[in-house]
Amino acid sequence: MTISAYGSGAYRAATPNRLVSTRSELTDLERQLATQQRAESYGDLGMDRRVSLDLNNKLSTLDSWLEGITRGDVNLKIASQAVETYAKLTNETVNDTRSNTYLPSSTGRSAPQVLAEEKFKQTLDLLNSQVNGRYLFSGKTADIEPTVTYSEIIEGDGTGRAGLRQMINERRLADLGAAGLGRLTTGGAGATATIADETPAHGYGFKLAGATSSSAALTPTFTAGPPADLSVTVASQPAVGDTLRVQLSLPDGTQEEIVLTARAAGTTGPASDSFEIGADVNATAANLRASITAALGKEAATTLSAASSQVAAANFFAGSTNSPPLRVPGPPYDTATAAPAAGTAANTVIWYRGDDGSDHARSTATVQVDTAQLVGTGARANEEAFRIGLAQFAVMAVESFPATDANSQARYEAMTARVSEKLSFGGSAQKPAEIITELGTAQTSLARAKERHESSKNYLTTSLAGVENVSKEEVAVQILALQTQLQASYETTSILSKLTLTNYL
């Protein structure tokens, strides 16, 4: 009979389990040393799993905000650069249109007009800027190119939809009228000269606004109406140099004044600004009537023509998909009396194809930078500041001033004066600088949010590392301890496996 070593059976039964457990612990420590991760799953973190989940969720949210901020910042920088370039183009045009820039040419166009055409095209390119397939000036419809082509805007599409050139011609016909006197009628008899607004009253052409005389010899009587009328009586022979002044309101909101000066009998001078003193008051009145007609004709061909272009261009660029441009009813246009009515997408080019809602342009695209903070980064190509510039560039590009036309220089100067005034963005008109400021403010908001979130991310990342990560040094020490323990266990097990009572004794 063989007597087993005391307790060796119990030890052998327990030792394998302990060795397996220790070996498993060693394997896990080796994994921790390789990955620097405390656990492979949230469940293995024990009570720290809630902390880990919370920190990871917060970091994910911060990453989402930071990614949006990065994209938004790129969009804002490109949009801001586009608006700044546009502002420079408008300033250059103001300088180009200063006085004494008219030079007759075989093409009927001056150098500033050619430059304005190029600026118009460049502005369209700026407004069609896109980043990663997103158009920056299309409002909420970021997948739609906001403007049509230069050719389509100016000339129409060739299939019956009118462009700006046609709309300007229609408006000019309506303003000048069949007689070319700005829809005013002239007349009188004996010692009287008369001017009157057309009947029935309408919104085209000149509107009489008043009259004054430097002498009692010329007595004006003005009736405001509408329709307004003016009667001038030659009460006695005027002296050389006496003047009659007639004030006219134009459809673009400007005012002009006709000044007619009496000149000595037998002398010559332009009928559009002077009249000859006749043999008697009746003859003088007849000369005055002829001078009034000539002056109105010249004013209609120059300042009124320039005003017509402004009105038509403003109406054209105010048009959008939901609100097509206003057009003069017709043909015929030169006798039109009905107010301008909206065209349709079938007969009029709609230059702007983007979103044209009533909400603020900046709100059409937003970046969420915090739980309750949205930063507006949107823009629309049909914002007032852009419409004004496009209209002025287009007017200069469309107009022609033949060298053979005696009124070309006066009409050119009337055009450039209006272009320069409009491009000053005076009064309550939106200015490019306002858009630049708003986009700059949005950039500042994004930068501050980014700085704040990066600071928070660094703190949370450090906190998460304390929960999920391990120290290589500590793990290495634990591994050495376990290796020593395993080695001792293996040696002890080996010795005990050979132990018998005989060996023990």
Label for each model-derived stretch:
Residues 1-152, 402-505:
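Amphipathic alpha-helical polymerization modules
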Residues 210-235:
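Charged, amphipathic alpha-helical segments
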Residues 231, 360-362, 478:
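Short alpha-helix capping/helix-loop boundary micro-motifs
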